[in-house]
Amino acid sequence: MDGRGPYGLACQNCAKGKVKCIAMPDGDGCQRCHRLKKPCHPSHGVRKRESQHFQSPLIEEMDAKLDSVLSLLQSVYLQPSSPNGQAQQYKRKASTPELSSPTQPARTSVSESTYILPPGPLTSPDIVDAEGALNRFREEVLRFCPFLYLPPGLTARQLQQERPFLFETILSVMTRSVQEKMNWSKRIKSTIAHSMVMENESNIDLLLGLLVYACWSQDHYLKRMPTLTRIVELAVSVVMDLNLNKPPPPDAHRLTELGGGNDPNWTRKGPKIRTAEEKRAVLGCFFVSSIISSYFYQMDAMRWTLQMEEDLGSLAASPEWPGDAALAVHVRLQLLAENARKLRDEHGTKPVHIPFFLKSFRFELEAIRNSIPPDLQKDDTILSQLHYVELSIHETAFTANVIPHSINTNNPIGPDAVDCMWHSLLAIKSWDTIYRRMPPDDHTRWSIIQWIHLSRAVVTLYRLSTHPAPDWNRDAVYKTLNIVDVFTHIRASFDQLVPNPGGPFPNDFWAHGWLLGRAIATWLHAPGRLHPPNTDEPTAWAQTSSSHNGEQVLPTWNPPAPALQPQPIQESLQFTNPAWMDGLGLPPGDPTGGMHQAAGLHPTGQMHF
């Protein structure tokens, strides 16, 4: 008779009767079979239970969708590139990435990749040649915000290996196709989300790529919302994680400061030697965050520190390329504008004392102007920033913006405010002189910095041209700088950016910018918007003018009946408000549709100049 098996193996008779099977003390069968005098045979195995499936319809539907997505990704990555230049397949690898050939598919392995991003239909000839895109960015674009140095000998393959995310962002900003910009936007943001949220990465590659994307992606226009503030805030967070803005404090009390655990060779690390690349990146992050925060008002600028002051001094003293000296001047000027904003904010809702406020900042601005290196004193990007900061200081001291129903527009603003507004007008006029001598093609290379310069200049000029204060001479504003002429020149500059005039409307980003310019011009020329003054009669303001530092200053004004009507103050140019663009006939979320009618285009989509 066989012995008992392991737990759960009853003999055949006990198993059939579904009773407890207890072995005999001598191991010869079980007690039940011995009592019933039956042969005791062990069973041969455990009866397998039938598995129960509780698959909900929702899970089955999700599994089906996941299978379709995986099959789509596999089909995209396994298909060869087209002969006319299919975009390279870019991937983020745990090992060193490699630039794929335009005529061969990228060698991609799921096992060796940290994550893979599916490429969009990026077939524009402007970016298929990565070397050409890199050279154009280095030679034509980077000078408008020089927080990055790309040596002349640096190739696209080397840049992709050393700075893969920066490489992708450069390619993304160098295309003019609206659809490709949107495709790149999804890829870049997917990379940002995975790297910073899922993988908790912080490195110089991410920081530089974020700054490039913030400066040149035009994402705020494509998405019709101020998304750049979040991108810049992410860049600031990378700076904080890397301690680029300041070293760890000496009283740091994290648990890791106690020692290296079981490692006998652990020693506390000393201060890290900062590279020039890191110094440029942190200074560029401050520059971009400060000027974007002053435009969108949805974030605070990066705080200035002593470490950044040292970086600024060392970069200006030992520049590796001309952009280092230019970056130092840009940062100095923007720091002055930021300090003016901080001083204004400290007063809260109370108005600042205009003469005292302007005295110190004008002195500092003049000191920076005199310290500009000789080879940069005629640089248009530097001069544009100089006049922008001058305008910012005077607008901070006293703004020409009038909020409807909040103040009595019949009250005079006083000579100090008039003087401040007049200097704002002179700063805009100086900026306009610089702008008019820039070639129209520079618009395609501008960073967000230059676009903010233009926006503040035209918005403030509009407010000065329609300010209702009785002691402010709108006739003199119109004679000094005609806002209609300014917009006419802007529109003429954009006209030269449109490819194939008179043909079908192209999928070109700057063609849409041309449409926006025409829409604004149409809005400005609407009946009742602006009324030119009578320029034949001499103004009382011109008779009481005085001189200040060689410039004409008009401190007081006793006007006749105003010739320039201020009715549209409540409709002031609100470039930061998406609803304002919708009012021009631009539907939200679509940078193409709806603009034709607002710009005066033919319904067939033909461009008529």
Curated annotation (Swiss-Prot):
Compartment annotation:
Nucleus
Task: Cite the residue spans of the region called Disordered.
Answer: 82-118
Q: Name one GO cellular component term.
A: nucleus
Ligase as a keyword of this entry, yes or no, is: no
Q: Which UniProt keywords apply?
A: DNA-binding, Metal-binding, Nucleus, Transcription, Transcription regulation, Zinc
Q: Which residues form a coiled coil?
A: none
Quote the DNA-binding region ranges, renumbered to this chain. 11-40
**Is the keyword ATP-binding assigned to this protein?**
no
Composition bias, Polar residues:
97-114
Report the CDD domains cross-referenced here.
Answer: fungal_TF_MHR, GAL4
What biological process terms from GO does the record include? regulation of DNA-templated transcription
Q: Name one GO molecular function term.
A: DNA-binding transcription factor activity, RNA polymerase II-specific
- Role according to the record: Transcription factors AN6788 and AN6790 act in tandem to regulate the expression of the non-reducing polyketide synthase pkfA from the aspernidine A biosynthesis cluster. They do not control the expression of the other genes involved in aspernidine A biosynthesis, nor do they regulate the expression of the highly reducing polyketide synthase AN6791 and the esterase AN6793 with which they are predicted to form a secondary metabolite biosynthesis cluster.
Identify this protein by name.
Transcription factor AN6788
Which organism is the protein's source? Emericella nidulans (strain FGSC A4 / ATCC 38163 / CBS 112.46 / NRRL 194 / M139)
Highest classification ranks of the organism: Eukaryota, Fungi, Dikarya, Ascomycota, Pezizomycotina
